[in-house]
Amino acid sequence: MSSTFTSLRGLATRLFAGGARPSPSSLLLPNKPATAALPTAIQHQQTASYASKGKSGPPAGMFSGQKAGSKKSKGPKQVDPRIINILRHFAVLSPKRIPPPLRFGRNRYLRHWTIHRAWLLFRRQQREQRERILMQQHQSMSNACEELRNTEGPGTRETGYLYRVAMLKNGVYGLKSIPIEYASRALVETPGRQAWNHEWKR
């Protein structure tokens, strides 16, 4: 901290050594160029030193805050490859890449519209039929569970014993449960050719 304060004091001493110190009002004015803070005498001294060395004057931009010898970089600007990948990805969605709408005659458009609507109607009927079958299966399982809950036995067991045993699922996922050959069978909408192999042994 002390070295920073010393360097600032030395800089202020060199700036205000050649002329009068600026007034506080001049320092508070907004949008003041950087050359206003330098005394005019320092600028004249630097210009005279360049003239004594055989030069016409200080380099351009010395008093305007521009770095001496700074040049604009030439050549193409380097672009981040990640930006290029993003632009290529979204270029497919550009309006220039979207194909124009189909232009049909009146009769051909009517045929196209009829086939399209018929296909949508067929898919909706299939979806509703599948949902109806699933709803019936769920209702059947619910009725079976309700029947087990109201059933007595076996033997002297109390009412609902079979329902509790069915909901506990003890031994279903063990070695003595359903054979893996049947448990891993792919679920299909139609029954298999052989529903159960009674002669199978582990």
From Swiss-Prot:
Gene3D superfamilies, per database record: 6.10.250.3440
Record-level GO BP terms: mitochondrial translation
A GO MF label: structural constituent of ribosome
Protein name: Large ribosomal subunit protein mL40
Keyword Ribosomal protein appears in the UniProt entry: yes
Name of encoding gene: mrpl28
Family matches, as InterPro entries: Ribosomal_mL40_fung
Protein family per UniProt: Belongs to the mitochondrion-specific ribosomal protein mL40 family.
Organism: Neurospora crassa (strain ATCC 24698 / 74-OR23-1A / CBS 708.71 / DSM 1257 / FGSC 987)
